[in-house]
């Protein structure tokens, strides 16, 4: 695998360099500019699950499996990478003070999923639909209800409350 890592990293890096900055700008527009990290460490790991990843908020680090091709073509790995990176600043007290730290990683992942799909649509990486959200929940192994997330996201987009308020509301909806 060590010899294969450059082959596995290359396409993802190229896609990120081409679309990642615009993707993150859209995340800031859709949610809160404070979510944009100045830098993040991306660790590419062995593809044990055939596509997977995790955001580790305290270290501003994401781990993503190095797959040779998108396991789910309608959900490109570069969107997964952007989704993971978009979670990293959600541990800022101004954004998450009303969410218990033990629940924050789960709430962060769920909260940023519809934003990531919307950002992906804006930079022409994916579509943004309730069906794709449900597919992302399944394929990216999130324990969440697509209907609840869709309702939360639509309510957020209509009213645009501070993202910290929306995050706390999502936490209560998931309880």
Predicted feature descriptions by range:
Residues 1-60, 122-131:
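Auxiliary, metal-adjacent structural segments of Zn-dependent hydrolase domains
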Residues 4, 8, 19, 104, ...:
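Non-membrane alpha-helical secondary structure
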Residues 8-19, 69-76, 100-108:
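Conserved aromatic-histidine-acidic binding/catalytic patches
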Residues 18-26, 78-82, 109-112:
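Well-ordered, non-membrane alpha-helical segments in soluble/globular domains
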Residues 38-43, 62, 109-116:
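Hydrophobic beta-strand segments of well-ordered beta-sheets in folded domains
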Residues 64-95:
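Active-site recognition of the HExxH zinc-binding catalytic motif
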Residues 89-155:
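Post-HExxH zinc-binding segment in Zn-dependent metallohydrolases
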Residues 142-175:
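Hydrophobic, glycine-enriched assembly/anchoring segments
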């Amino acid at each position: 695998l060590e010899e294969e890592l450059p082959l596995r990293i290359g396409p993802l890096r190229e896609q990120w360099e081409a679309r990642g900055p615009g993707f993150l700008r859209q995340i800031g527009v859709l949610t809160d500019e404070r979510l944009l990290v100045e830098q993040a460490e991306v660790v590419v790991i062995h593809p044990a699950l055939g596509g997977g990843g995790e955001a580790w908020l305290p270290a501003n680090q994401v781990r993503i499996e190095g797959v040779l091709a998108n396991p789910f073509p309608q959900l490109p790995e570069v969107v997964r990478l952007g989704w993971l990176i978009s979670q990293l600043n959600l541990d800022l007290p101004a954004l998450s003070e009303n969410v218990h730290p033990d629940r924050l990683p789960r709430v962060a992942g769920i909260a940023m999923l519809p934003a990531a799909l919307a950002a992906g649509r804006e930079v022409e990486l994916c579509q943004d639909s309730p069906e794709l959200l449900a597919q992302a929940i399944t394929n990216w192994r999130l324990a969440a209800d697509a209907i609840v997330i869709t309702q939360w996201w639509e309510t957020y987009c209509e009213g645009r409350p501070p993202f910290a308020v929306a995050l706390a509301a999502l936490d209560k909806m998931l309880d």
